[in-house]
């Protein structure tokens, strides 16, 4: 049985990452394992910034946003020599397995280490909710509340000025955060990678609302779909209504994690340790139908796809 494990957070931070680290540390210590924290993700792993953690190391972190271990982008980890040095650093401390908390990019690093013979378990931590093999990722629901709060505030001022507002939401190539926040926030139109951008339909929908006497309209837009400010100008030119774009940006990644994210992160952290004790490696954990599951990390990255929530898109269309 393994005796020492490491844990790191990688990629964009997400509320609940601290709770996940805490779950890993305390579950491992309860089962008689030693735990080492790696600071600043794969970069810190390569630079040997590794420190032994205790129960008190993770005291008072469950309610904190961000990640106390830190995170960093480190594209150099694609280099096999860099990964070999990382593995050497792990072995120097006697670490036999690694828990990686992050999104798809972080999983790729874990996959590469697994292929080089070092067992890793991936935990999905990203507000984008774009990781395969799980219904929800850590941080998603906290970010959802942040976006909804912003939409509520935009609705107030948009109504006062009879204005059209575009709110740009994170998500990269996944529209889950935009979709759910649009439904919960009562937006009038949604643009995501799953729906595509249809300008004529958008203008027709807005004009229909104006004709019916609506004082405002809120358009929820997933980042990278189009330039939000250019779209605002286009809408204003076509409708004659003042239109403003609000890019929420990194505010979506911060803040205290919700109860759901804290519990999800704690469950996933403890489950990752359980898998390592059972001798599993090269896996990623998830939650499906409220049950903890695990998948081959290579299969999750290369073959598994997140299902499109057609039922929710249909609901959104009816409600808008």
Swiss-Prot record:
Annotated EC: 2.7.1.11
A single GO BP: fructose 6-phosphate metabolic process
Enzyme class: transferase
Swiss-Prot/TrEMBL keywords: Allosteric enzyme, ATP-binding, Cytoplasm, Glycolysis, Kinase, Magnesium, Metal-binding, Nucleotide-binding, Transferase
Pathway in which the depicted protein is active: Carbohydrate degradation; glycolysis; D-glyceraldehyde 3-phosphate and glycerone phosphate from D-glucose: step 3/4
Binding sites annotated in the UniProt record for Mg(2+): 104
HAMAP family the record matches: Phosphofructokinase_I_B1
Name listed for the protein in its UniProt record: ATP-dependent 6-phosphofructokinase
Organism: Photobacterium profundum (strain SS9)
Lineage, broadest ranks: Bacteria, Pseudomonadati, Pseudomonadota, Gammaproteobacteria, Vibrionales
């Amino acid at each position: 049985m393994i005796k020492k494990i490491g844990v790191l957070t990688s990629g964009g931070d997400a509320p609940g990452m601290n709770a996940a680290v805490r779950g890993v540390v305390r579950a491992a210590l309860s089962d008689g394992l030693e735990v080492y924290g790696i600071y600043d993700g794969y970069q810190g792993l390569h630079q040997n910034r590794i420190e032994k953690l205790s129960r008190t190391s993770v005291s008072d972190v469950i309610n904190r946003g961000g990640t106390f271990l830190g995170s960093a982008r480190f594209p150099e980890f694609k280099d096999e020599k860099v990964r070999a040095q990382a593995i050497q650093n792990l072995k120097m401390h006697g670490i036999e397995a690694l828990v990686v908390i992050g999104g798809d990019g972080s999983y790729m690093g874990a996959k590469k280490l697994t292929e080089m013979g070092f067992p890793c378990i991936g935990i999905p931590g990203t507000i984008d909710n774009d990781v395969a093999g799980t219904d929800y990722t850590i941080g998603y629901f906290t970010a959802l509340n942040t976006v909804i709060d912003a939409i509520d505030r935009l609705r107030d001022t948009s109504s006062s000025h009879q204005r059209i507002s575009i709110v740009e939401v994170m998500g990269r190539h996944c529209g889950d955060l935009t979709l759910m926040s649009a439904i919960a926030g009562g937006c009038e139109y949604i643009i995501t990678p799953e729906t595509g951008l249809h300008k004529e339909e958008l203008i027709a929908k807005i004009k229909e609302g104006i004709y019916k006497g609506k004082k405002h309209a809120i358009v929820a837009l997933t980042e990278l779909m189009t330039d939000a400010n250019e779209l605002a100008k286009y809408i204003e030119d076509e409708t004659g209504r003042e239109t403003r774009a609000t890019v929420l940006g990194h505010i979506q990644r911060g803040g205290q994690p919700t109860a759901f994210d804290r519990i999800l992160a704690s469950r996933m952290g403890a489950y990752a340790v359980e898998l390592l004790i059972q001798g599993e490696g090269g896996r990623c954990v998830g939650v499906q139908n409220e049950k903890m599951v695990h998948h081959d990390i290579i299969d999750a990255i290369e073959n598994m796809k997140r299902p499109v929530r057609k039922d929710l898109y249909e609901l959104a269309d009816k409600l808008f």
